[in-house]
């Protein structure tokens, strides 16, 4: 019988053998995983748990909040504020940062999260998920005792120390990187623990699948239109092969599919809001997903620049996102460069 390795054991071995995970970071990841279990149970209850529908409020982006958005946000805050592993948190669902109250010890890390990505799919029972990203506080001066401010969160994605997501679908699956490849853990509901089910996940460099919202085609910039036009021409076109389109309208679900079998995900800038660089959030979605994809051998850009090299100017900054199989992402990027 194959030996079952729990998330806790995996993290301990990463800490002991590779020295990659200090104790506070290990605790943080375990607490986030426990919070995701609670969110999973709430999602699974659906109409039986009075968690469906809208909450009658809007988040900082002006989006109508679902009841589960608020529940998931509260679960993550309550689980992480008291353990001594965090200094502050930031969420897509909150205007500003949440500093750990003085009655609790403060830790060395900052946690950012999208508590429930794809929440527009909640009421139709499509896979949704939690995305998270971890940074060191006071990255430029770790010895300072200055209070944490919003500016401490404004670090480029390549300074992340852990990132991952938990997808709530037919299985509840946690996908994680600490900078040494990508590992996947599946929730064993009978045991109540996440168990390692895949390690060293790799994204194929080439693909025949793309994920994009085709209804917005008339609003895209020329390089994106060119790329999709060539895909649609199939074997008779310049690509010489047929492509399939996939679009779930849940980033966590689309990226999970790409990690499992390859593909390219695109949520590009469009002409309807020319002053905005994109739709997805750099800090809560693009950075953690971009790092996971890169750690699995893929690539992630905004069309012109590597996602992880973008210096954020604000907490809720938006960005155009193109990520997935490396050769396809490189092709789209070259079209933006006029190559």
From Swiss-Prot:
One of its GO terms (cellular component) is cytosol. It catalyses: beta-D-fructose 1,6-bisphosphate + H2O = beta-D-fructose 6-phosphate + phosphate. It comes from the Bacteria. GO terms for molecular function: fructose 1,6-bisphosphate 1-phosphatase activity; magnesium ion binding. Binds 2 magnesium ions per subunit. Its cofactor is Mg(2+). GO terms for biological process: fructose 1,6-bisphosphate metabolic process; fructose 6-phosphate metabolic process; fructose metabolic process; gluconeogenesis; sucrose biosynthetic process. Pathway: Carbohydrate biosynthesis; gluconeogenesis. Its EC number is 3.1.3.11. The keyword Cell membrane does not apply. Keywords: Carbohydrate metabolism, Cytoplasm, Hydrolase, Magnesium, Metal-binding. It is found in: Cytoplasm. Belongs to the FBPase class 1 family. PANTHER family: FRUCTOSE-1,6-BISPHOSPHATASE-RELATED (PTHR11556), SEDOHEPTULOSE-1,7-BISPHOSPHATASE, CHLOROPLASTIC (PTHR11556:SF35). NCBIfam families: PRK09293.1-1, PRK09293.1-3, PRK09293.1-4. This is Fructose-1,6-bisphosphatase class 1.
């Amino acid at each position: 019988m194959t030996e079952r390795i729990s998330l806790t054991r995996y993290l301990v071995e990463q800490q002991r053998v590779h020295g990659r995970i200090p104790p506070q970071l290990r605790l943080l990841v375990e607490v986030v995983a426990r919070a995701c279990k609670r969110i999973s149970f709430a999602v699974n209850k659906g109409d039986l748990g009075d968690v469906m529908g809208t909450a009658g409020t809007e988040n900082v982006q002006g989006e109508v909040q679902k009841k589960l958005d608020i529940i998931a946000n509260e679960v993550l805050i309550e689980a992480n504020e008291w353990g001594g592993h965090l200094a502050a948190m930031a969420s897509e669902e909150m205007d500003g940062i949440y500093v750990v109250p003085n009655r609790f010890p403060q830790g060395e890390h900052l946690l950012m999260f999208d508590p429930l990505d794809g929440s527009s799919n909640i009421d139709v029972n499509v896979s949704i998920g939690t995305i998270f990203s971890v940074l060191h506080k006071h990255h430029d001066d770790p010895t300072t005792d200055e209070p944490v401010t919003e500016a401490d969160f404004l670090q480029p994605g390549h300074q992340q120390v852990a990132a991952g997501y938990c997808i709530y679908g037919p299985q509840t699956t946690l996908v994680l990187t600490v900078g040494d490849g990508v590992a996947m853990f599946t929730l064993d509901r009978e045991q109540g623990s996440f168990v390692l089910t895949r390690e060293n996940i790799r994204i194929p460099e080439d693909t025949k699948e793309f994920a994009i919202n085709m209804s917005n085609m008339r609003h895209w910039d020329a390089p994106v239109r060119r790329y999709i036009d060539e895909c649609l021409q199939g074997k008779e076109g310049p690509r010489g092969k047929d492509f399939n389109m996939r679009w779930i309208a849940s980033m966590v679900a689309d990226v999970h599919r790409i990690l499992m079998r390859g593909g390219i995900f695109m949520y590009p800038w469009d002409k309807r809001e020319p002053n905005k660089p994109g739709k997805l959030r750099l800090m809560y979605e693009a950075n953690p997903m971009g790092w996971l994809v890169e750690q699995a051998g893929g690539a992630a850009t905004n069309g012109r620049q590597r996602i992880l090299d973008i210096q954020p100017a604000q907490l809720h900054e938006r960005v155009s996102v193109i990520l997935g199989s490396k050769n396809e992402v490189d092709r789209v990027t070259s079209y933006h460069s006029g190559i």
